[in-house]
């Protein structure tokens, strides 16, 4: 019995990659220094994986920004606008990820989307010229040879041709048609080069196969691989899937020329049933994904061994594997000195998951009952308390009317118009303002008890004053307090709710250099005291203008945390919803007229198969949001915000959330959402996001005016809000002020024309 992992976190044990790249972005280090830091990290990771006794060690899973972009660059799928900048390869790569504004030109970044049902974001490759598609990159070969120098025969990992092709945004059908042929030839050339290097195994990741596949999808997949696998020669090919099962194509895969199939037995609801029904091919190896790559709880070896024993009825050729890449979990629990050992023993981050794979291999390769098995089973005895009877009773007492807001949206809109007295095209921001080093160090000093609560509060109040003043000088209509007290929109609420646990170093990559530290939902959730009330009241006291109350919604808190596995996601979300509802009512009672409840991650846990959307997710996720705000008065305006996702196919459900205003992250996708909003007669007022905050470039007044005009061509002027597409926390003040001034100027210019 051997073991394997799909891929490993690339940010480093202490986010070394993030800091090295950011240093380069700030011109504080050279290209050579950045590339050396990256290589050092790769070497460290390989040695760690090797030391842990993993047989199939991945290479090419490392990335300076995003592995989808890496695959696109490998095959020269680069839009002409980036080529025309005439930058060197590394800076062209970063121009695609972040945009570019400088002496060589001014271009926006590639669109960013959620990676399937995770909180990782990938960059959408753009192809306007298929003629140039060819194997021009060498990253995959270089990194294989780097590992080889360490004495490691690695398994290069690459996104498969079918998934990559499906993720590319093509200029038109003609470009797409030519790209299909060119990309196939490029992958064939890749196979040839890997054969020349005498590579043993290549892992091709095809997560797109876990979606509902059409006949056309299956035909395209077969067309690609029937040709491609004829060129594999001595190269062994592992087809790796994750985030679901392969029910639409599994029987065909058994007859294919793949040497191994990687199946997900954590999220793949039908993976085992498919094997029980169709068996497994004698000429193939099964890479069994039984270590959860997306959650941080320790593996129960009894359950894993039971699964392996069942699989062994159908094949003896089994490799123990992770269910998906380990980049979705933190690096290691060894940096957690503050968490009580009674909790910590039940957690397994990436490094500990390597140990679990090693243990399981050893247990399966030994004949008698192994002490490793007994030690694992002991972990699950005497678990700390998770239940709260008061929370259970409150959930039980919920009635149907608790999930419905009255009066109707139409009636509320008239009442709010009279009450709020906002101009046409009201301007606002999404919530957070830049968090400079002094804001972060003030928060850290307070956490480490180096300063008093009074000092901490006074510092933040001064920052709020400055933030309100900046917004008033710029001329925004609805203000925010800036969220200087918050490290992260989810972690902050988790820290102030009962039922959550927190790590010191549990960082996970969200996109590029952005890392998040998800809380752990351990027990039943409740609010013991107001969370944001004092900050909101203070901010509102500073201005005659409306200052929004800012909260994170229950679905986002759930989706951006590591969830419990002992109760349903529905129950966990409803518990959080009741806690946030208490906060909403406190804000309203304090005179806060607009309350924003962000559901940035609503789409994130949407099942990948459409048939499961309602029964497994939307039927409880939307009501959970309704539960949060159903108790407010008609004159209180409820806002929500969503980002990084495609929403066009669930807009009716979003409308059913019954918020009064919703802001979307739509600027990176060229406002394509607007046509759907218009088509379905979306009732909620909308702020589509007029510029991309993930890029350091400052949009001009002309550019913003054109964007606003584009929105006005699609939606009634009474329905539109003008705002950036996301929070401003990660940007510098000079970019923010310049961008917002241009936003207000453009809006005023358009108002005059109306």
Curated annotation (Swiss-Prot):
The protein's annotated pathway: Amino-acid biosynthesis; L-methionine biosynthesis via de novo pathway; L-methionine from L-homocysteine (MetE route): step 1/1
Query: What EC numbers are recorded for this enzyme?
Result: 2.1.1.14
Q: Which residues form a coiled coil?
A: none
The residues forming the signal peptide are none
InterPro entries assigned to the protein according to its UniProt record, in alphabetical order:
Cbl-indep_Met_Synth_N (IPR013215), Cobalamin-indep_Met_synthase (IPR006276), Met_Synth_C/arc (IPR002629), UROD/MetE-like_sf (IPR038071)
Q: What is this protein called?
A: 5-methyltetrahydropteroyltriglutamate--homocysteine methyltransferase
Q: Which residues bind 5-methyltetrahydropteroyltri-L-glutamate?
A: 15-18, 114, 514-515, 560, 604
Cofactor(s) needed by this chain: Zn(2+)
Q: What's a single GO BP term from this record? A: methionine biosynthetic process
Family membership noted in the UniProt record: Belongs to the vitamin-B12 independent methionine synthase family.
Catalytic positions are 694 (proton donor)
Q: How is the cofactor bound?
A: Binds 1 zinc ion per subunit.
Q: Give the matching NCBIfam families.
A: met_syn_B12ind, PRK05222.1
The record ties this protein, via SUPFAM superfamilies, to: UROD/MetE-like
Reaction(s) catalysed by this chain, per the record, are:
5-methyltetrahydropteroyltri-L-glutamate + L-homocysteine = tetrahydropteroyltri-L-glutamate + L-methionine
GO molecular-function annotation terms? 5-methyltetrahydropteroyltriglutamate-homocysteine S-methyltransferase activity; zinc ion binding
Q: Where are the transmembrane segments?
A: none
What Pfam families does the annotation carry? Meth_synt_1, Meth_synt_2
Broad enzyme group: transferase
Q: Which residues bind L-homocysteine?
A: 430-432, 483, 598
Q: What keywords are annotated for this sequence in UniProt?
A: Amino-acid biosynthesis, Metal-binding, Methionine biosynthesis, Methyltransferase, Repeat, Transferase, Zinc
């Amino acid at each position: 019995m051997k073991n394997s992992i799909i891929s490993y976190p690339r940010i480093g044990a202490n986010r070394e990659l993030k800091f090295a790249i950011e240093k380069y972005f700030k011109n504080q280090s050279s290209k050579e220094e950045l590339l050396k830091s990256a290589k050092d990290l790769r070497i460290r990771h390989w040695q760690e994986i090797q030391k842990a006794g993993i047989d199939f060690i991945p290479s090419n899973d490392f990335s300076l920004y995003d592995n989808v972009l890496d695959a696109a660059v490998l095959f020269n799928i680069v839009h002409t606008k980036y080529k025309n900048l005439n930058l060197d390869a590394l800076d062209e790569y970063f121009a695609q990820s972040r945009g570019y504004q400088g002496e060589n030109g001014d271009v926006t970044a590639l669109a960013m989307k959620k990676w399937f049902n995770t909180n990782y974001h990938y960059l959408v490759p753009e192809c306007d010229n298929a003629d140039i598609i060819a194997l021009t990159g060498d990253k995959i070969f270089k990194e294989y040879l780097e590992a080889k120098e360490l004495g490691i025969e690695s398994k290069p990992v690459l996104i498969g041709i079918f998934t990559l092709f499906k993720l590319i945004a093509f200029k038109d059908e003609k470009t797409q048609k030519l790209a299909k042929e060119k990309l196939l030839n490029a992958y064939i050339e890749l196979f040839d080069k890997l054969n020349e290097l005498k590579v043993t195994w290549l892992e091709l990741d095809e997560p797109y196969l876990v979606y509902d596949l059409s006949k056309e999808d299956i035909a395209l997949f077969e067309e690609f691989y029937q040709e491609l696998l004829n060129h594999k020669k001595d190269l062994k090919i592992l087809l790796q899937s994750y985030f679901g099962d392969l029910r639409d194509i599994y029987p065909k895969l058994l007859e294919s020329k793949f040497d191994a199939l990687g199946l997900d037995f954590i999220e793949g609801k039908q993976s085992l049933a498919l094997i029980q029904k169709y068996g497994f091919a004698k000429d193939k190896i099964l890479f069994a994904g039984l270590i959860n790559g997306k959650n941080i709880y320790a593996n129960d070896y009894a359950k894993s061994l039971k699964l392996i024993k069942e699989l062994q009825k159908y094949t003896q050729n089994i490799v123990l594997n992770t269910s998906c890449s380990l980049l979705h979990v933190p690096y290691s629990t060894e940096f957690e000195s503050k968490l009580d050992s009674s909790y910590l023993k039940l957690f397994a981050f990436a490094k500990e998951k390597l140990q679990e794979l090693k243990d399981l291999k050893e247990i399966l390769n030994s004949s008698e009952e192994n002490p490793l098995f007994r030690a694992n089973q002991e972990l699950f005895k005497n678990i700390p308390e998770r239940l709260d009877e008061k929370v259970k009773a409150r959930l039980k007492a919920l009635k149907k009317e608790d999930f419905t807001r009255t009066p109707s949206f139409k009636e509320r809109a008239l009442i709010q118009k009279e009450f709020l007295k906002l101009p046409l095209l009201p301007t606002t921001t999404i919530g957070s303002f830049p968090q400079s080093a002094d804001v972060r160090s003030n928060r850290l000093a307070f956490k480490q008890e180096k300063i008093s609560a009074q000092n901490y509060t006074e510092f933040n109040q001064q920052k709020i004053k400055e933030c309100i003043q900046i917004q008033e000088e710029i001329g925004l209509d609805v203000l925010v307090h800036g969220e200087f007290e918050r490290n992260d929109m989810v972690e902050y609420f988790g820290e102030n709710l009962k039922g959550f646990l927190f790590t010191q170093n549990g960082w996970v990559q969200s996109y590029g250099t952005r890392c998040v530290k998800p809380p752990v939902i351990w027990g039943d959730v409740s609010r013991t005291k107001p969370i944001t009330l004092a900050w909101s009241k203070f901010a509102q006291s500073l201005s005659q203008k409306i200052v929004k109350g800012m909260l994170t919604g229950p679905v986002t808190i759930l989706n951006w945390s590591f969830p419990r596995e002992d109760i349903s996601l529905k129950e966990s979300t409803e518990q959080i919803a009741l806690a946030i509802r208490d906060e909403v009512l406190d804000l309203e009672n304090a005179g806060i007229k607009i309350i924003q409840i962000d559901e940035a991650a609503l789409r994130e846990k949407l099942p990948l198969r459409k048939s499961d959307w309602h029964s497994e997710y939307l039927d409880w996720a939307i009501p959970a949001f309704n539960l949060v705000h159903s108790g407010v008065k008609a004159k209180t305006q409820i806002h929500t915000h969503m980002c990084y996702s495609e929403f066009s196919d669930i807009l009716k459900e979003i409308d059913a959330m019954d918020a009064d205003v919703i802001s979307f992250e739509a600027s990176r996708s060229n406002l394509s959402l607007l046509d759907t909003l218009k088509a379905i007669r979306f009732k909620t007022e909308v702020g589509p996001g007029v510029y991309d905050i993930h890029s350091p470039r400052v949009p001009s007044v002309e550019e913003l005016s054109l964007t606003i005009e584009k929105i006005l061509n699609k939606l009634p002027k009474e329905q539109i809000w003008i705002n950036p597409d996301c929070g401003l926390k990660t940007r510098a003040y000079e970019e923010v002020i310049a961008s917002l001034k241009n936003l207000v100027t453009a809006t005023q210019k358009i108002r005059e024309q109306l």
